[in-house]
Amino acid sequence: GGSTAAGNVTSHAEFNIWADPEAAAFVFDSGISLTMAGLNLTRQVTMGQPEIDTMSASSTPTAAAGAGALDYYSDFSMAHYGVKQSAMHDPCAVLEVVRPELFGRQAMSVNIETAGVHTRGMTVCDQRANAVAPDTDVLVDAASSVVVELIVQAAIDPAS
């Protein structure tokens, strides 16, 4: 969850953080090792009609279900953001654990806004080189085509 820039449920807040900013603040302030796969990253890794068609052509239930979900979300994305693509939010978070080399990261100090009238639920990411106590590895880029290929392949052949 989170974002170094714009949100998706408000102009500044990403849904998961916005839904319970106090809990998110507790986690981000806990001192445990954190990696954030925010909207700034996941919006770089998208699937469109070619990937949906590839998955639809597969005979596996996983690919069929994935294609249906992607088709629905692509329509939603078109209606709300003007882009007929699906951002790969959760798959990026999972793939970072199993294939971390596919992602670039930057250490940042991340705080959660819990009181702002217009910014409640915002992840405040200090991207300055001299940031005080960077405490979170924030994913900033991805080998997008490789990530998308791995997701499609996993849907077509879940044993791969």
Model-predicted regions and their roles:
Residues 18, 22, 37-160:
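Conformational coupling and interaction surfaces
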Residues 1-43:
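Active-site histidine-anchored catalytic micro-motif
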